[in-house]
Amino acid sequence: MEDRLVGCRLSEEDVDEVSLRPRKFGEYIGQTKVKENLMVFIEAAKKRNEALDHVLLYGPPGLGKTTLAGIIASELGVNLRITSGPAIEKPGDLAAILTNLGNFDVLFIDEIHRLNRSVEEILYPAMEDYALDIIIGKGPSARSIRLDLPKFTLIGATTRAGLLTSPLRDRFGVINKLELYSVEELGQIVKRSARILNVGIEDEAAEEIARRARGTPRVANRILKRIRDFAQVKSDGFITKEIARTGLEALEVDEIGLDAVDRNLLMSIIEKFGGGPVGLDTLAATIGEEPDTIEDVYEPYLLQLGFINKTPRGRMATKLAYEHFGLKYE
């Protein structure tokens, strides 16, 4: 169900998202404190002629973790190698990647919490000592040799920082949480993306899209592209507030960015479970979703809105959620 318009996961439709990504900190909107700190750390590393400390970026999907990794590599003036936790199946895969890095290069591992344990253990000496421990032979004659690696920077990204093991988490010198974006920041992102796409847009239309983008740049850019279609077919190609509203209504994205999936989740809690509490697994089975997807994709925005509460006994719909649907809160 993550092919929905306001889904935060990267989809095939987002393959051209790269063209909209900022390449320098000067182009990057939002995450001000994270950005300012990273600029200091990068400048210090360059002055000392050292590799930047390993960086962990965590937070909901679609907030720009991959984009930040690209900017860090660009600002350092080094190469960026991108992979993901599930793609590194065995220690040899990681060893091949590490030995092909250049000095001070950046290795970006998305979904780093999904690394298997044997691969993760290879990372420990690589991160700490820039070395690779390799076992040669088997049984009593087996011996370990240590290979020196280039001094590199690992940037790990995850939506689930709590699933990282302590030994891995403790080896990151820089740990940053990315927060959902404000409407004002998203409005700036929409206008910047519109310029890149050569689409004219009113300030009020950009704000309309931003208000319904769930605090997420990826969602804002995806909505912008669909509204561009409506402007092209229904009008002269220029996005007005009226065109934006017409398109968003047709796409069933409401005034605060909820779509049919969100409404189904909230109404299930309200109607089927009396407002809650309801356990995560039970709720997931009811709406046909995975528990992880509810936690990582749907809940961050609903929590930010104050529409649900997480309690030890399960999820509960709040008074604000009832009021949004015009229901009486009891």
From Swiss-Prot:
EC code(s) of this entry: 3.6.4.-
Binding site for Mg(2+): T66
Enzyme class: hydrolase
Molecular function, one GO term: four-way junction helicase activity
CC annotations in GO: cytoplasm; Holliday junction resolvase complex
Residue ranges of the region described as Large ATPase domain (RuvB-L): 1-181
Catalytic activity of the protein: ATP + H2O = ADP + phosphate + H(+)
Region annotated Small ATPAse domain (RuvB-S), chain positions: 182-252
Ligand binding (DNA): K310, R315
GO biological process: DNA recombination; DNA repair
Chain positions covered by the region annotation Head domain (RuvB-H): 255-330
Highest taxon of the lineage: Bacteria
Subunit structure comment from the entry: Homohexamer. Forms an RuvA(8)-RuvB(12)-Holliday junction (HJ) complex. HJ DNA is sandwiched between 2 RuvA tetramers; dsDNA enters through RuvA and exits via RuvB. An RuvB hexamer assembles on each DNA strand where it exits the tetramer. Each RuvB hexamer is contacted by two RuvA subunits (via domain III) on 2 adjacent RuvB subunits; this complex drives branch migration. In the full resolvosome a probable DNA-RuvA(4)-RuvB(12)-RuvC(2) complex forms which resolves the HJ.
HAMAP family to which the protein is assigned, alphabetical: DNA_HJ_migration_RuvB
Family membership: Belongs to the RuvB family.
Domain notes: Has 3 domains, the large (RuvB-L) and small ATPase (RuvB-S) domains and the C-terminal head (RuvB-H) domain. The head domain binds DNA, while the ATPase domains jointly bind ATP, ADP or are empty depending on the state of the subunit in the translocation cycle. During a single DNA translocation step the structure of each domain remains the same, but their relative positions change.
Protein's name according to its UniProt entry: Holliday junction branch migration complex subunit RuvB
Organism, scientific name: Acetivibrio thermocellus (strain ATCC 27405 / DSM 1237 / JCM 9322 / NBRC 103400 / NCIMB 10682 / NRRL B-4536 / VPI 7372)
Gene name of the encoded protein: ruvB
